């Protein structure tokens, strides 16, 4: 079976790796064009390109997916199937090209969390489970027929990074299984509507921007704690807070927290520092304990180290 693999970030590498290491016929890899990065604006390769170069795979990096030259090259490869993992929205002329279609790996239990940031939003919303889904591409984003699905638990100690890493491995295995059942003509793809009943509340996973990452100090301590977990380590929750001895608020990135539900008389949003060892923010129903943070121009550090540096 001739496979074209499409992906860009680290999350996609594990899926490509499992195919290459198990001798599946990957005839080409499609990834984003190189982008200038850093102070020197040096061109940076995607994680997928780095791996593809290492394995001497054919690499295509179209600026536009409807480019005639790119489409001609895709067609000449005569792929039986295309696999998409963390790439971009494909036009029909691309996803409809292979004889067996194109499937995508999505990091949620579809139809829940359609969109760009499913791992983050599942944790932010306090879900206890998530998973990975393979589905055939169609016109509407993340709505195609489900091929395979597997669940994992979201642990209280998890953040977006740990769930990302587990789903990356689980998803790679799901990609391999999906290719096998398609190759064996054993697919029983299910319409996503079969997973929706009258009391289903569909949650979305929209793209996260810097302003999305600001902590809402009017929420409960548990909600804020989950928000921090869901944004950690990337793109990172932040809040602006008045530090001791300062007249203007400082923006702090917050990577790790704990919380305590308790009645108190402190002003909401107030920072309370105890013996330069612990720091907590007063919220409406308790305290949010800051564990790992980053101040502007500083490295990421534990709260005790940060407090020792305050004057």
Segments from the language model and where they lie:
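Internal anion-binding site segments
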Residues: 198-311
């Amino acid at each position: 079976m001739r496979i074209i693999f499409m992906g860009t970030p680290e999350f996609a590498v594990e899926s490509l790796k499992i195919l290459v290491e198990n001798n599946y016929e990957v005839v080409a890899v499609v990834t984003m064009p190189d982008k200038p990065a850093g102070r020197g604006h040096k061109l940076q390769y995607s994680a997928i390109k780095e791996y593809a170069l290492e394995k001497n795979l054919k690499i295509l990096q179209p600026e536009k997916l409807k480019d005639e030259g790119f489409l001609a090259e895709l067609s000449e490869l005569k792929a039986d199937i295309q696999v998409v993992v963390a790439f971009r929205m494909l036009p029909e002329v691309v996803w409809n090209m292979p004889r067996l279609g194109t499937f995508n790996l999505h990091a949620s239990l579809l139809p829940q969390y359609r969109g760009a940031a499913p791992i983050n939003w599942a944790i932010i919303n306090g879900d206890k489970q998530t998973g990975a889904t393979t589905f055939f591409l169609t016109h509407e984003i993340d709505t195609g027929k489900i091929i395979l699905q597997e669940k994992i638990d979201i642990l209280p100690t998890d953040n977006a990074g740990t769930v990302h890493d587990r789903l990356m491995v689980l998803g790679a295995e799901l990609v391999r299984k999906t290719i096998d059942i398609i190759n064996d003509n054993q697919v029983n793809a299910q319409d996503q509507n079969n997973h929706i009943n009258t009391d289903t509340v569909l949650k979305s996973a929209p793209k996260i921007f810097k302003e999305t990452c600001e902590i809402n100090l009017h929420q409960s301590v548990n909600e804020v704690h989950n928000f921090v977990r869901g944004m950690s380590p990337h793109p990172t929750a932040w809040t602006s807070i008045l530090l001791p001895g300062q007249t203007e608020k400082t923006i702090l990135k917050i990577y790790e927290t704990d919380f305590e539900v308790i009645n108190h008389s402190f002003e909401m949003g107030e920072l309370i520092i105890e013996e330069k060892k612990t720091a907590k923010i007063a919220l409406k129903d308790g305290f949010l304990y800051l564990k790992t943070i980053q101040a502007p121009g500083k490295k990421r550090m534990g709260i005790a180290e940060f407090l020792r540096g305050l004057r």
